[in-house]
Amino acid sequence: MMDPMINLSVTIITFNEEHNIARCLQSVKGLADEIVVVDSHSTDKTRELAESFGAKVIVRPFPGHIEQKNFAVDQTHYDWVLSLDADEALSEELKKSILKIKKGPKYQGYFFNRLTNYAGFWVKHCGWYPDKKLRLFNKNFARWAGMNPHDIIKMKPKSQKGFLSGDLLHFSYDSI
């Protein structure tokens, strides 16, 4: 008998991300079983756009990146979480890799490379790529930690981690 596919929650923290959020949410369409957006009182259309993609939007003050991301994870219904920033999107290859993991994960967390777009150019040098990130994890084995704003996923001891093909596309710099 084949195990059923795991359900996947996607978490995103936001503040005035109307220019990014649709691209991010479009990239997880057909992959996410639940989307939780924790918004820090945006004054633009971030919340409305997120809701138009079916996201559950929770508004609360911003206590810091780590605290806000852990709060978002705590609001999810499923054990498996894909944590994204609003200025990120999945490449098609990464999306396919995650779909394979949904059929039966072998590890408690997964790394993949993040590729940054700087003013319209993909940066694959200067130490910016590969930029390995652990963003897909079983929340029973992981928590956000580190120092704000440089958050990292801290896995429980003896947790196993794998690596997925495909890039997390990072659109953080629109201009110089």
Predicted regions, residues:
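A conserved acidic beta->alpha catalytic loop
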Residues: S27, L31, D39-E48, D85
